Each structure stands twice: as structure tokens, then as C-alpha cells.
């Protein structure tokens, strides 16, 4: 019982182009990768990009340049959706924190607020042991 080609076309979703003027850029900068998600005010994702998804593998993912390329890619897609103003929320200690924000700014998107939302424990879980190199 073969499925017709019509069935596959129904499953493939067409990207809906939204017209959103301002949103939030969530930058998650870990030591291994940088993830940029651009959402509207309600938190619905408009675009996202990762350093690994831009073709960087291994230790090159954790570079500021990889974060810059990922931010440019996510920002361009968001601009196509109509984004003009952004709040930037940065989470994590990674090397791509600053370069991701600079890349978004260079695209011509107006950045209103830069906020650090890195979670800090009030002495919660025991951290991993110290690395000895």
C-alpha cells in the first residue's frame, strides 16, 4: 500500500511569514557551542541558529567567529520576518557572548536592552570536580 505523493506534500509545512517589529534574541553561549534563538515578545520562535549548524565542528564551534556567523544567519532570517528592534538576553559563560551581540547590531537591528540571564545557583547542586591539566 504505497502512499501517494500528495500525502508527503500535506506533511511538509510551509513557513509562515510573520510581520513582527520587535522581539527577543536569546543567546546561549556555552563553552562548547553558541545557540541564538530570536523570538517574538510572547516567546514564539522566529529563527534560530547554532555555531555547529553553520558548519563549524569540534573546537571551532566554541569560537567567537562561529558565534558571529550564527548570529548573522539568525538575524537575517528574523529581519525577513520584519524584526527591527531586539532585546538581547545572554546566558552562559562562553566565548561567543559578545561577538553574537555585535553581529546582530551590525545587521542594522536596533538593540534596546542587553540583559545577562545566566543562572547562578544559591548553593544548589555540587559542581563537577576541577580539571587538572
Curated annotation (Swiss-Prot):
One of its GO terms (biological process) is translation. InterPro entries: Ribosomal_uS11 (IPR001971), Ribosomal_uS11_bac-type (IPR019981), Ribosomal_uS11_CS (IPR018102), Ribosomal_uS11_sf (IPR036967). Gene3D superfamilies: Ribosomal protein S11 (3.30.420.80). GO terms for molecular function: rRNA binding; structural constituent of ribosome. GO terms for cellular component: ribonucleoprotein complex; ribosome. Disulfide bonds: none annotated. Keywords: Ribonucleoprotein, Ribosomal protein, RNA-binding, rRNA-binding. Part of the 30S ribosomal subunit. Interacts with proteins S7 and S18. Binds to IF-3. Located on the platform of the 30S subunit, it bridges several disparate RNA helices of the 16S rRNA. Forms part of the Shine-Dalgarno cleft in the 70S ribosome. HAMAP family: Ribosomal_uS11. Belongs to the universal ribosomal protein uS11 family. NCBIfam families: PRK05309.1 (NF003698), uS11_bact (TIGR03632). This is Small ribosomal subunit protein uS11. The gene is rpsK.
